[in-house]
Amino acid sequence: MDFSTNGSEESELYHAQIHLYKHVYNFVSSMALKSAMELGIADAIHNHGKPMTLPELSSSLKLHPSKVNILYRFLRLLTHNGFFAKTTVKSNEGEEETAYVLTPSSKLLVSGKSTCLSSLVKGALHPSSLDMWGVSKKWFHEDKEQTLFECATGENYWDFLNKDSDSLSMFQDAMAADSRLFKLAIQENKHVFEGLESLVDVAGGTGGVAKLIHEAFPHIKCTVFDQPQVVGNLTGNENLNFVGGDMFKSVPSADAVLLKWVLHDWNDELSLKILKNSKEAISHKGKDGKVIIIDISIDENSDDRGLTELQLEYDVVMLTMFLGKERTKKEWEKLIYDAGFSRYKITPICGFKSLIEVYP
């Protein structure tokens, strides 16, 4: 190899090296975050009620004295990444000491809060989600339609969850945690639900989203529709009930059908079935309702590169776990029109997701 380069080429080479190394070692930041969550660092600082010094934090976490410097170095990385912030406090002797406080991001890891997303972090970084990448080369070369997860484990993710109660509970907790943040979207987009008398939350799990909608709009009769083994033992009330069934066969009738975090699990063929069944469900009593989709709408030309990167990463997650996909506006439009709908409206919500209203 010829290492004779001019200044411009040297600079380009160094920047390329930094870019490569950064992506190679991105996993360190993820695992440091997981360690912080498992140690309960955010909980410790929150419960302390004020900025926390390194010795105070180490003592609260009951760490061995030899690990104090290791904790410092983890905190240095996590602080650089925006999960904690540093401030200065006075010690009992009047000397200034560095102390740590929570940031908006680490507040999402505080246990017991309605906005806590610890279960999502735990699920995304669980060995079952990471180990599959070891067979990616085999997956690319084999002539078989299966997920990367199935290639690695011999079973699809849904079957894995149904056999592993701990993983199923973790998955349901993660979905419920994500749904709790949906409350903000409801408050900011009340007009979407105004005028509705009934709504079906398809694949609504244990009813977290339906309950939020019911709280905000008590007059709306909400039905949570999911697999019988998911909703079979759940109890509702006069305006909130649970129905078991198969969304690929039919969907209960209502003024509106909600598909939150559903269609990205499935390829276009299966998503088309769900949408057609949803269209039939809202066409009753001589009037047409609407389908409300909560999902990602990828904008590859967005000025927010971080947002687009997250959306594209989610797309690869859906691909490797479920053979699903995150869709661009053009892909959403084709899917919606192929299902027989006449118009739609996309509204960005919840940071990186979109609310898509679809009409017959």
From Swiss-Prot:
Active site: 264 (proton acceptor)
InterPro entries reported for this sequence: COMT-like (IPR016461), O_MeTrfase_dom (IPR001077), Plant_O-MeTrfase_dimerisation (IPR012967), SAM-dependent_MTases_sf (IPR029063), WH-like_DNA-bd_sf (IPR036388), WH_DNA-bd_sf (IPR036390)
Its EC number(s): 2.1.1.270, 2.1.1.46
One BP term from GO: methylation
Record GO terms (molecular function): 6a-hydroxymaackiain-3-O-methyltransferase activity; isoflavone 4'-O-methyltransferase activity; O-methyltransferase activity; protein dimerization activity
Entry protein name: (+)-6a-hydroxymaackiain 3-O-methyltransferase 1
Recorded name of the encoding gene: HMM1
Enzyme class label: transferase
Keywords: Methyltransferase, S-adenosyl-L-methionine, Transferase
Family of the protein in this entry: Belongs to the class I-like SAM-binding methyltransferase superfamily. Cation-independent O-methyltransferase family. COMT subfamily.
Residues that hold S-adenosyl-L-methionine according to the record: 202-205, 226-227, 246-247, 260
Membrane-spanning segments: none
Gene source species: Pisum sativum (Garden pea)
Pfam families: Dimerisation, Methyltransf_2
Catalyzed chemical reaction(s): (+)-6a-hydroxymaackiain + S-adenosyl-L-methionine = (+)-pisatin + S-adenosyl-L-homocysteine + H(+); a 4'-hydroxyisoflavone + S-adenosyl-L-methionine = a 4'-methoxyisoflavone + S-adenosyl-L-homocysteine + H(+)
PANTHER family tied to this protein: O-METHYLTRANSFERASE
Record's function text: Methyltransferase involved in the phytoalexin pisatin biosynthesis. Has both 3- and 4'-O-methyltransferase activities. Can use (+)-6a-hydroxymaackiain, 2,7,4'-trihydroxyisoflavanone and with much less activity (+)-medicarpin as substrates, but not (-)-6a-hydroxymaackiain, daidzein, formononetin or isoliquiritigenin. May be involved in formononetin biosynthesis.
